[in-house]
Amino acid sequence: MLAKRIIPCLDVKSGIVVKGVQFRNHEIVGGILSLAKRYTQEGADELVFYDIEASSNNRLIKKKWVSQIAEIINIPFCVAGGIQTIQDVQSILSSGADKISINSPAISDPYLISRIADRFGVQCVVVGIDSWFNKEESQYYVYQYTGDNTKTIKTSWKTCDWVQKVQALGAGEIVLNVMNQDGMKNGYDLVQLKKIRKICNVPLIASGGAGDYFHFYDVFNEAKVDGALAASVFHNRIIKINQLKKFLMKKGLEIRVC
């Protein structure tokens, strides 16, 4: 059995790590490098770095940020932000990333997933999916350009359909960002994650809602995800990664020892 992954996330806006609630009202958290170093020292299994404005502004994440982080960490490093071409991927990987994540660009050009997978391998391609639960329709939909709420749009894709589509195109991993839960700290959306787990045959990462130790245990134990991504609880030191891992190990989960 593969060890469950604990993954801190750095959402970056204008060169500073920020965090919002339901993808809105972002507040400054801290510096990119100091947080990256701290999470490595605390025992994170992977680091995810999102330039949340890049796709909305039709630009690529700054390579200098990628290379600076890569120099000070020794864990797998996933990068996202405005990646639209094979050349963009090559540039980011050459700067020190281990894999890339695409979200909004994949919605505009789904076969970008296939082109990247064919060139670099499926293990290099993560697809991020921003999912919002529409109460009126009792349905989950995929949203695009969520890094800027003035440009965010609801797509015609139902989340379950998009999950199946990106797998068919070559996604090697899926990060499901549950927008309703983002920053709320009241737990991951286990209902949606269980549904997605049934149709997801690649590693599935849960994102959005972590607030305490049991939220991590529940998402691993009940939704059977492969990794849990979080930001607020780590940034604000509500939870320290090494202590979280000890808790999960005592609960019987397979966890990489720090």
From Swiss-Prot:
Q: In which pathway is this protein known to take part?
A: Amino-acid biosynthesis; L-histidine biosynthesis; L-histidine from 5-phospho-alpha-D-ribose 1-diphosphate: step 5/9
Catalysis performed (reactions):
5-[(5-phospho-1-deoxy-D-ribulos-1-ylimino)methylamino]-1-(5-phospho-beta-D-ribosyl)imidazole-4-carboxamide + L-glutamine = D-erythro-1-(imidazol-4-yl)glycerol 3-phosphate + 5-amino-1-(5-phospho-beta-D-ribosyl)imidazole-4-carboxamide + L-glutamate + H(+)
Name the top EC class.
lyase
Say which family it is in. Belongs to the HisA/HisF family.
Quaternary state and partners of this protein?
Heterodimer of HisH and HisF.
PANTHER family listed in its UniProt record? IMIDAZOLE GLYCEROL PHOSPHATE SYNTHASE HISHF (PTHR21235:SF2), IMIDAZOLE GLYCEROL PHOSPHATE SYNTHASE SUBUNIT HISF/H IGP SYNTHASE SUBUNIT HISF/H (PTHR21235)
- What is this protein's record name? Imidazole glycerol phosphate synthase subunit HisF
Give the organism, scientific name: Buchnera aphidicola subsp. Baizongia pistaciae (strain Bp)
From the broadest rank down, the organism's phylogenetic lineage runs: Bacteria, Pseudomonadati, Pseudomonadota, Gammaproteobacteria, Enterobacterales
Gene symbol here is hisF
